[in-house]
Amino acid sequence: MHTPPALPRRFQGGGRVRTPGSHRQGKDNLERDPSGGCVPDFLPQAQDSNHFIMESLFCESSGDSSLEKEFLGAPVGPSVSTPNSQHSSPSRSLSANSIKVEMYSDEESSRLLGPDERLLEKDDSVIVEDSLSEPLGYCDGSGPEPHSPGGIRLPNGKLKCDVCGMVCIGPNVLMVHKRSHTGERPFHCNQCGASFTQKGNLLRHIKLHSGEKPFKCPFCNYACRRRDALTGHLRTHSVSSPTVGKPYKCNYCGRSYKQQSTLEEHKERCHNYLQSLSTEAQALAGQPGDEIRDLEMVPDSMLHSSSERPTFIDRLANSLTKRKRSTPQKFVGEKQMRFSLSDLPYDVNSGGYEKDVELVAHHSLEPGFGSSLAFVGAEHLRPLRLPPTNCISELTPVISSVYTQMQPLPGRLELPGSREAGEGPEDLADGGPLLYRPRGPLTDPGASPSNGCQDSTDTESNHEDRVAGVVSLPQGPPPQPPPTIVVGRHSPAYAKEDPKPQEGLLRGTPGPSKEVLRVVGESGEPVKAFKCEHCRILFLDHVMFTIHMGCHGFRDPFECNICGYHSQDRYEFSSHIVRGEHKVG
């Protein structure tokens, strides 16, 4: 009969015994052996055919050791076995004041793990501490064997969890797995109190406090705390492929994205891309007769001169277009402008630049009204003073999705219709919606004496006014045609157009201030439009018109129907809706 040797003196004294699959036992479950050590009373008497291994870790009863010493530098107790023992696994701590006990017979010892499996079991400590992957295990339907600590020993030497049936390669993995059933988290952070089931998770957590980032990218200065995060980052440096990493790469700065739409958004703020557009625009402007077809966006450096601060309406346009992902229908972005001197709304040779001309293209009150066409009264808008002919070459294009000023560039002016920003330049030949409204008095014997505009039933307008995508004026003093809106085929109203538009939609309010407006397509046919009488805005889409009318109050048209804010006029109302500063309650 073999008697186990006495435990070292530092292990003597009261303590609780716990197996990996059991709860803490009381002191009644302990009995002292003659040598003074603590032996659980549930252990069988040691015989020639049986032996046991005890692995334990005790903390000093004084309690002066810190958590860091407990989990990072605590001494590990030796493995104690009988002379017949042929296998001893490295000891691991369960928790403070706990003992892990393993029992197996000599018959089991004949089926111990081979050298390869013993090597894997020794590597369990690496798996437990690294803990970046799930514990090794699989479901096995093998029959039960005599009980091992907290599990069932299988014929292949592995352990099976007696709670869920998970098969573990060794006792250490099973021990960590059992904590998912018991809720035990023995590893604690002494700085924030967070607890973990594995030591590797605690070590990784400590890096958050120390700021350590050991994993560094070999291609750039990126660093991170986790290996899997570095693996995900390395995909950005991989070869562009639809199946690997982020295939959509910016050719100007090298950044990669997972989606084409994200790449398009990036190009709107990519400094290198905008700088290349600026250089390309200057090169094209220096070649007379060439058309600007590849210009997708004009940067702010081209929109405004260095000595002139950007106006509020232009800054508003830029801020609104950045929110295109949240809008039902996107704005017409900054696109190509082609303009010729023959299309200018004044006589170049006469030098009469005092004529005020206003061009409003695809205006909206808020991001939700992306398909609306604004018609703001010309008598209230700020006039655009066109300079004499000797200054035409010094003009720079001012392009905005909210307020567009008409200034010359080589070629002729074309504004695209409401379409997605990512479409190619092959669709640019279709002219966008334009509204031309002269400020000067119109001399026409058949015009109305109040505003000088012809009636909508007049059919004597020039055929040149119906040219697709272009609104032009004669060069001399002949009578001017009524204001005309030319709508491209991309407009939402073009698909819904009625060959006989309602007269009420094309006329202004009857009375002394009656106005006439013709909305035609690019081939000259009439297009249905919906006009807000309060804001004097034309909508080509009935849905957007309905949404807009819902913003007006029932009692006062300039009362916000969302928050109840009262505006003095339609400009203040439009500004309030655009800003979206609704204070409800």
From Swiss-Prot:
Keyword Nucleus: yes
Keywords: Acetylation, DNA-binding, Isopeptide bond, Metal-binding, Nucleus, Phosphoprotein, Repeat, Repressor, Transcription, Transcription regulation, Ubl conjugation, Zinc, Zinc-finger
Protein location: Nucleus
UniProt region (Interaction with FOXP3), positions on chain: 281-585
Bias (Polar residues) ranges: 79-98
Domain of life: Eukaryota
Cross-link (Glycyl lysine isopeptide (Lys-Gly) (interchain with G-Cter in SUMO2)): K100, K500
Gene Ontology molecular function: bHLH transcription factor binding; DNA-binding transcription factor activity; protein domain specific binding; RNA polymerase II cis-regulatory region sequence-specific DNA binding; zinc ion binding
Biased segments, Basic and acidic residues type: 25-34
SMART domains: ZnF_C2H2 (SM00355)
Main location: nucleus
Annotated zinc fingers (C2H2-type), start-end: 159-181, 187-209, 215-237, 248-271, 530-552, 558-582
Pfam families found in the cross-reference section: zf-C2H2
GO biological process: negative regulation of DNA-templated transcription; positive regulation of transcription by RNA polymerase II; protein homooligomerization; regulation of transcription by RNA polymerase II
A GO cellular-component term linked to this record: nucleus
N6-acetyllysine: residues bearing it: K335
Phosphoserine: modified positions: S105
Segments carrying motif CTBP-binding motif PEDLA: 425-429
Further remarks about this protein from its record: 'Eos' means 'rising sun' in Greek.
Comment text on domains: The N-terminal zinc fingers are involved in sequence-specific DNA binding and heterotypic associations with other family members. C-terminal zinc fingers mediate homodimerization.
Protein name: Zinc finger protein Eos
Organism encoding this protein: Homo sapiens (Human)
Gene designation per UniProt: IKZF4
